[in-house]
Amino acid sequence: MNTIVFNKLSGAVLFEDGGASERERGGRPYSGVLDSPHARPEVGIADGPPLKDNLGLRHRRTGARQNGGKVRHKRQALQDMARPLKQWLYKHRDNPYPTKTEKILLALGPQMTLVQVSNWFANARRRLKNTVRQPDLSWALRIKLYNKYVQGNAERLSVSSDDSCSEGGENPPRTHMNEGGYNTPVHHPVIKSENSVIKAGVRPESRASEDYVAPPKYKSSLLNRYLNDSLRHVMATNTTMMGKTRQRNHSGSFSSNEFEEELVSPSSSETEGNFVYRTDTLENGFNKGDSAANRKGPSKDDTYWKEINAAMALTNLAQGKDKLQGTTSCIIQKSSHIAEVKTVKVPLVQHF
């Protein structure tokens, strides 16, 4: 009995001995647990001041970003407000002194006051004088040289959207075309009108090309008509020419100038002079022949002039039936523009 009790007691004692470490561990104050080297990484409680510093840094960075965005937006707004004033300064660079009416009109666009516009132009003229210090320079040259002399982050007199590229005022229309913002609605009608002019100019160019092709055809038709009329005129004046040659007592020949006065020259150029006349003989008279173009070979020219001489001889035969011996004329071609009519005697057959 005692043994059992002892065992039980010993067991209890043993039980108490086994849990003593736990009781001792649980009985220790929390400061000891916190001071132990193994417990600190497990708990991981950060100190108070570094956490506050980190939060302050984050807040400062966020505020700096917001402030930077505000500054950038404000700078862009000021540039947009000053852009129409810069454009006016470029346009009137010979005399950059706007009148009161012009200042009022300039103030309406960027929603500025009259005093702000006046101050901006006064400051701009002052900057031009202080930056370009060369004496006896006109305002136009100062504005042109301003961007070359300006240094640092000073405001430049460019009218681009970001005011970063330096424009010397040589091509202000190009800067107007590249800008955006305030001046975009102003230039849209100009661009649309230019596009409409370009679109409208496509058809006139095609018409011009058609007209360029058409005149040779029209000219050739006129030339053919002129040649036909001249042929009729030549055939009509043969009788008068033969009468004049008879009145001159068979003088042999008359000069090319007289021939050109009496016969209208069918052409005034070498290309038109290549058109020649061809007449065909019929039983009752002569009919109008087509013009043979570009007769250049010597054999064709000989044949042509033989036909002309035969036609002249037949004309004289028809007109001089009552005479035994008459005269006729043969045309001798010396060049493309000069021709000579030579009168020769041709025996005629008497009709009974």
Curated annotation (Swiss-Prot):
One of its GO terms (cellular component) is nucleus. It holds the Pfam family Homeobox_KN. GO terms for molecular function: DNA-binding transcription factor activity, RNA polymerase II-specific; RNA polymerase II cis-regulatory region sequence-specific DNA binding. The keyword Nucleus applies. The keyword DNA-binding applies. Residues 19-53, 157-194, 245-272 are annotated as: Disordered. Gene3D superfamilies: Homeodomain-like (1.10.10.60). Keywords: Developmental protein, DNA-binding, Homeobox, Nucleus. InterPro entries: HD (IPR001356), Homeodomain-like_sf (IPR009057), KN_HD (IPR008422). GO terms for biological process: cell development; muscle organ development. Residues 71-132 bind DNA. Signal peptide: none annotated. It is found in: Nucleus. Belongs to the TALE/IRO homeobox family. May act as a morphogenetic regulator of cell adhesion. This is Homeobox protein Mohawk.
